[in-house]
């Protein structure tokens, strides 16, 4: 999917296209570009990249660049009204390269997964990514070549402990995954696995944490994630939330994740962020400090948080040392298998995950 970093240039003319996304087709070097047309008749649409202008009919909604080179592309889409006037130019970036994704696990094979949430996540992954591979930590310890993968996904969700398993802490495993991330590989980490960003040295700020395990409890509420950080930073446009519907709650934009019923509530979140810098929870300068010092982007908090007290989901940006991007999803409401009932918001769990994987594949 597109990175979501959109640049617009205003000029007189018609309305611009919306929701431009670029995705590398799995197993190929083809780039599929899609967009939504404005509510007016167009004479043509142009796709622009590498000093090329591809002219399409006014009703075109997609274009494919075939056999693209392994490099970063900046792709623009421009629409023209019936008078021939061009719209604002909308650009998005994509880096073409490997597309293979691996699902990490402790057990030797996928069949050995016992946790219900980890199993549900694995089932969804292999149904939606048939070219994906299961990769155990023992295989990594024995020298598996991680350079063949674009993204590694690890969900660790334990009822018994929040500690990371010994297999993941083997020095050879830590060093291999660290090198993968240093070299530009993407990481998607769920629940207790978000702590691995500290294990490999990407995150260093010693924020207070709230990591929980246990069997859970019955609860009649719908739990959401707040994506309007501090009521000032609207993350609904971030690519991992593409296609998800949000609603207003107490001046915040929230996305529902789990409905009434049994909840394990396995949080893996970081809190007292502002206190770490001796700043107030409502201080905008604290948000800037948190973001810039660790080179992160806070993507979600609990739905009752109105300030910068904590972060539940976040993105780590490339740094001078680590060229890779990571998405950490630690909010307790992000539960892959709701016990004893069907989660009416399961599609939001799945769509966020799909978006995150595709987003990381563009980096």
Task: Show which residues each predicted segment covers.
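Beta-strand-rich modules
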Residues: 1, 65-85
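Short S/T/G- and acidic-enriched coil/turn segments that sit immediately N-terminal to beta-strands
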Residues: 58-63
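A glycine-rich, often tryptophan-bearing local segment used as a flexible ligand/cofactor-contacting loop or short
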Residues: 160-267
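Pro/Thr/Ser/Gly-rich low-complexity, intrinsically disordered linker/stalk tracts
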Residues: 3-40, 84-97
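A short acidic/glycine-rich loop-to-helix N-cap element
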Residues: 112-113, 334-352
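Solvent-exposed loop/turn segments flanking beta-strands in beta-repeat/beta-sandwich domains
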Residues: 36-51
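Helical hinge/lid and interdomain linker segments adjacent to catalytic or ligand-binding clefts
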Residues: 102-207
């Amino acid at each position: 999917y597109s990175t979501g970093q959109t640049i617009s240039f205003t000029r007189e003319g018609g309305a611009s296209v919306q929701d431009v996304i670029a995705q590398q087709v799995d197993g190929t070097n083809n780039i599929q570009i899609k967009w939504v047309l404005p509510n007016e008749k167009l004479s043509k649409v142009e796709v622009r990249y590498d000093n090329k202008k591809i002219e399409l009919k006014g009703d075109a909604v997609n274009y494919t660049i075939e056999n693209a080179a392994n490099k970063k592309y900046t792709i623009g889409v421009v629409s023209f009204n019936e008078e021939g006037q061009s719209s604002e130019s909308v650009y998005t970036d994509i880096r073409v390269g490997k597309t293979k994704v691996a699902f990490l696990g402790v057990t030797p094979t996928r069949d050995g997964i016992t946790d219900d949430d980890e199993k549900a996540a694995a089932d969804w992954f292999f149904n939606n990514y048939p070219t994906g591979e299961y990769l155990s930590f023992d295989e990594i310890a024995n020298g598996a070549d991680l350079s063949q993968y674009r993204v590694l996904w690890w969900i660790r969700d334990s009822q018994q402990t929040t500690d990371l398993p010994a297999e993941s802490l083997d020095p050879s495993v830590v060093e291999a995954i660290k090198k993968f991330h240093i070299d530009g590989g993407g990481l998607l980490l769920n629940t207790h696995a978000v702590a691995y960003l500290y294990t490999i040295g990407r995150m260093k700020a010693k924020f207070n944490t709230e990591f929980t395990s246990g069997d859970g409890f019955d609860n009649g509420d719908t739990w959401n994630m707040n994506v309007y950080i501090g009521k000032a930073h609207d993350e609904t446009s971030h690519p991992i939330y593409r296609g998800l519907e949000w609603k207003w709650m107490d001046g915040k934009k929230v996305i529902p994740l789990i409905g009434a019923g049994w909840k394990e509530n396995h949080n893996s979140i970081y809190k007292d962020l502002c206190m770490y810098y001796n700043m107030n929870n409502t201080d905008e300068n604290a948000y800037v400090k948190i973001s810039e010092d660790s080179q992160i982007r806070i993507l979600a908090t609990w739905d009752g948080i109105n300030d910068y007290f904590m972060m539940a989901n976040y993105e780590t940006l490339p740094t001078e040392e680590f060229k890779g991007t990571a998405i950490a999803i630690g909010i307790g409401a992000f539960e892959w298998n709701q016990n004893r009932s069907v989660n009416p918001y399961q599609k939001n769990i799945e769509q966020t995950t799909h978006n995150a994987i595709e987003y990381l594949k563009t980096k």
